[in-house]
């Protein structure tokens, strides 16, 4: 939601400007228009004077100043560049030109112009922000030391804190300035932004309301309110908040329109992502991340990886997303390297002082231990925020696996059955773990029914192997024999015959012990006859002899 760019934005048409209504025949003074922040009127007056030959010395500088404050940075750039070419160029123009380059995302040019300007508070603030953009910590600290305890410098510092995810530090500065300057209403929006980033959406709404009472049509404030509604309620509630902004098609704030289009994609669950997000990837920082999330939801892991592989993460969200993408790619490719990278990213976020007590931080630690297969530790973290995700299918999917992996198959089965997503319920990991839970919980018939519902595939073959072996270990020989029988038909591997033979003998022993109905013997004989092994006749002869002696129909 920050108004910053990551690529140059020159070229194209200037934003449309509204015509001013005439209030009389008296020509207003430039000073009056500037004091009223009527920058459109000021430009009109300056252009008129230029046209009739009444141009003053700094006309182009004032036009550049007004265009800059209207957000028309391309026009400001044109005026300032022309001013630098004049013979008696005012040296102050260089810092104004540098600021314009900065807002157009032309950071190298901004730095070059900034160093040509005479030393000033504004120049130091500009170079401070450029050092942050270039990730130059040494320069950042040098310019930081030059900041003074004046409002402009402190606001600049708060902005850097925000961009470095130091939200509480930014809040402290804004609140301190607000104590003595209640008229600085916009600071409430900045405070609300910080609370939003800290996941305090209700607090963000309360602070934002102070500003919206005075400025009810603020684009940025209404957009933030919509984002809070999205987090607190749902996408429809958020979209309703944006309706007034969408209806206001005449708004000259083009970047806000890009922001709204971006957020609508998020509010609508990714609808229109491929049409809206790609052009915004280097304009709105979150656009790249949301496009990566879209690709992940479409199971296009490779495309997600291509989009994020060169991103140097600087925020917890970026580290987390890189971790998720590497984990998904590692599972898809069977790559230990990608899994290791994912585990390190998760550990970095979850172990950080700023994130260790947040839900995302604990999710990261759970993910880290999950990849390390340390499921007791996984459960420690998952249990700490379980109450927030009772109906969340993804959470339940991971929680059930961890429960089952630690031997608590009873609760694992219960949680698996809470999952509603058909996509997850058809996933082999879900089917195999649920089958294992059924078997361990002495419900082998339900595990067998899971197999019967599957189409013939490599996954169904793997599930058969699981049922055959796990049922055998648990002494559930009937379903073990059935599974080994199908495996033997599909693949004449001697091991499958040995498994079936052992399971059939196991059933016979259970019949002898009175723990299995005698009628089951008929099906056991049928399973044995389907095998061409020489040992079959000897086993069948013994079983038939017993059946005859005990008058069991076969």
From Swiss-Prot:
UniProt main location, coarse: other
KO phenotype (gene knockout): Partial embryonic lethality and patterning defects. Surviving mice show hopping gait, polydactyly, hydrocephalus, and male sterility. Impaired hedgehog signaling. Primary cilia are not reduced in number and their length is normal. Mice exhibit defective cilia structure, including abnormal positioning and number of ciliary microtubule doublets, abnormal localization of IFT complex B components and significantly reduced ciliary tip accumulation of proteins GLI2 and GLI3.
Entry's Gene Ontology BP terms: axoneme assembly; cilium assembly; intraciliary anterograde transport; intraciliary transport; manchette assembly; photoreceptor cell differentiation; photoreceptor cell morphogenesis; protein localization to cilium
KW Repeat (keyword) present: yes
Keywords: Cell projection, Cilium, Protein transport, Repeat, TPR repeat, Transport
GO molecular function: intraciliary transport particle B binding
PROSITE patterns: TPR_REGION (PS50293)
Tissue expr: High expression detected in testis. Detected also retina, kidney, lung and brain tissue. The expression level is low in spleen. Expressed in the developing liver. Present in the airway epithelial cells and the testes (at protein level).
A cellular-component GO term for this protein: intraciliary transport particle B
Positions of the UniProt region annotated as Disordered: 1-27
Biased composition (Basic residues): 18-27
Keyword Cell wall biogenesis/degradation in annotation: no
Compartment(s) of residence: Cell projection, Cilium
PANTHER family (UniProt xref): INTRAFLAGELLAR TRANSPORT PROTEIN 56
Protein's job: Component of the intraflagellar transport (IFT) complex B required for transport of proteins in the motile cilium. Required for transport of specific ciliary cargo proteins related to motility, while it is neither required for IFT complex B assembly or motion nor for cilium assembly. Required for efficient coupling between the accumulation of GLI2 and GLI3 at the ciliary tips and their dissociation from the negative regulator SUFU. Plays a key role in maintaining the integrity of the IFT complex B and the proper ciliary localization of the IFT complex B components.
Family: Belongs to the IFT56 family.
Complex and partners: Component of the IFT complex B. Interacts with IFT46; the interaction is direct.
Listed name of the protein: Intraflagellar transport protein 56
Gene (name only): Ift56
